[in-house]
Every structure is written in C-alpha cells, then in structure tokens.
Regions:
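C-terminal-biased regions
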Residues: 1-93
Length: 93
C-alpha cells in the first residue's frame, strides 16, 4: 500500500470513529484507533460494524455510505455491510 492510500484510509477511518462517537463506548473507540494505528484497516472497519450491529444501532445514511465506500475499497464489503444490514436507518437531523 502506498503512502497516499495509507494516509487516506487512516484519515477516513479516524473520521468515521469521530462520527460514531455517541454510538461507541470509549473502549470501542480506543480499540478502533489502536487497529488503525497498527494499519489493520479492514479489521477496524469490521469491528466498528460488528459493534454497531450488536445493538442494532441506528445509522444515518451518510455514515452508512462511508462504510460502503471504505469496505468496497478494502474488499470486505459483504462482511461489513452484512453486519450493518441489522442496523436501522437514523435521521440526520
């Protein structure tokens, strides 16, 4: 993976963790950050999806699209989006 791709994924995943701040526990957010620090981008995205699906957490469409774009880029779309299919849509308001 080249530097630009690495930096892009790091920034996008950290942004996703920030967007999900109210839906994640502090331990979950910390664990996701540790996975990103270790360049385990696919696992970080899968774990975020799993944590959200455990409680069927409502997810805004824009956040769901972020998951879809990232998982498509990383090649784990079926795994990530399958977990998120349990989560209802939340309003962005």
């Amino acid at each position: 993976m080249d530097f630009a791709t690495h930096a892009d994924l790091t920034g996008r995943l950290r942004g996703l963790v920030i967007l999900l701040d109210e839906q994640l526990t502090s331990d979950q957010a910390r664990s996701a950050d540790e996975l990103v620090d270790a360049s385990e981008f696919g696992i970080a995205l899968e774990m975020l999806a799993d944590w959200l699906s455990e409680d069927a957490t409502p997810i805004p469409d824009d956040v769901r699209r972020d998951f879809e774009r990232l998982s498509s880029q990383m090649g784990n779309g079926e795994r990530v989006m399958g977990a998120l299919s349990i989560c209802p849509t939340a309003s962005d308001s």
